[in-house]
């Protein structure tokens, strides 16, 4: 049993201009930028619990 893995994502305040997207691809890139660090941190935490002593 690995226990509970708690990930918290930081929510940053953004200007209205930054939220406005002209191209659909731009929003996909922004989602990737937000998701990947959290996913890597979660994977690192799991591996640390599996292989850590």
From Swiss-Prot:
Propeptide: 11-34
Keyword Cytoplasm among UniProt keywords: no
Annotated positions of the Phenylalanine amide modification: 51
Localization per record: Secreted; Target cell membrane
Record-level GO BP terms: defense response to bacterium; defense response to fungus; innate immune response; killing of cells of another organism
Sorted UniProt keywords: Amidation, Amphibian defense peptide, Antibiotic, Antimicrobial, Cleavage on pair of basic residues, Cytolysis, Fungicide, Hemolysis, Immunity, Innate immunity, Membrane, Secreted, Signal, Target cell membrane, Target membrane
Chief place where the protein resides: secreted
Ranges in coiled-coil conformation: none
Signal sequence range: 1-10
InterPro entries per record: Frog_antimicrobial_propeptide
GO cellular component term, pick one: extracellular region
Record carries keyword Hydrolase: no
Function: Non-amphipathic mildly cationic alpha-helical antimicrobial peptide with potent activity against Gram-positive (including methicillin-resistant Staphylococcus aureus (MRSA)) and Gram-negative bacteria, and some fungi, as well as against Trypanosoma and Leishmania (both promastigote and amastigote forms). Strongly and selectively perturbs anionic bilayer membranes by interacting with the polar head groups and acyl region of the phospholipids, with formation of regions of two coexisting phases, one phase rich in peptide and the other lipid-rich.
Family recorded in the similarity comment: Belongs to the frog skin active peptide (FSAP) family. Temporin subfamily.
Name of the featured protein: Temporin-SHd
Biological classification of the source: Eukaryota, Metazoa, Chordata, Craniata, Vertebrata
């Amino acid at each position: 049993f690995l226990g509970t893995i708690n990930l918290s994502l930081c929510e940053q305040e953004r200007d209205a201009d930054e939220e406005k997207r002209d191209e659909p691809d731009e929003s996909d890139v922004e989602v990737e930028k937000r998701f990947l660090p959290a996913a890597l941190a979660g994977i690192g935490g799991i591996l640390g619990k599996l292989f850590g002593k």
